[in-house]
Amino acid sequence: MKLLNLASNNSFWRGIDYHHENRIIGWKELAENCYQGKVRGSGNAVYDVTIDTAHPRKSACNCPFAEGRRVICKHMIALDLGIFPEKEQQMMDYIEEQNQMYEQEYEKEMQEREEEIREYVMKLSKAELREKLIQRMINDLYY
């Protein structure tokens, strides 16, 4: 999944779209971990794509975005998924796992913050509490 991990968010999702749209015209294995193929791009353009799954930064494509640069483009992603379709599900599982971890961390942070607020408010005197409430209500008038 190295190649997929190195792609920008946009290249990754567009590459998945290209894979689903069957834009891979053909491919062949050049050597172990090295593949060459043709991917149909926008309009009638067809791009020559070479991917090296062991060394993704050695991958190449002659599209305007990637030509002469060491970046991962949507055509490389499409070719990689065309050759190894199981990678898509693995990546989706990984993304889901990361989202769940993020949501759990966010929920924990919110609970901690809520507890801090409760503790702070409970320490305020009645007069301080009234003043904070008045300030907030006045603030809300303008925002």
Predicted features along the sequence, with ranges:
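Long, low-complexity, compositionally biased intrinsically disordered regions
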Residues: 1-143
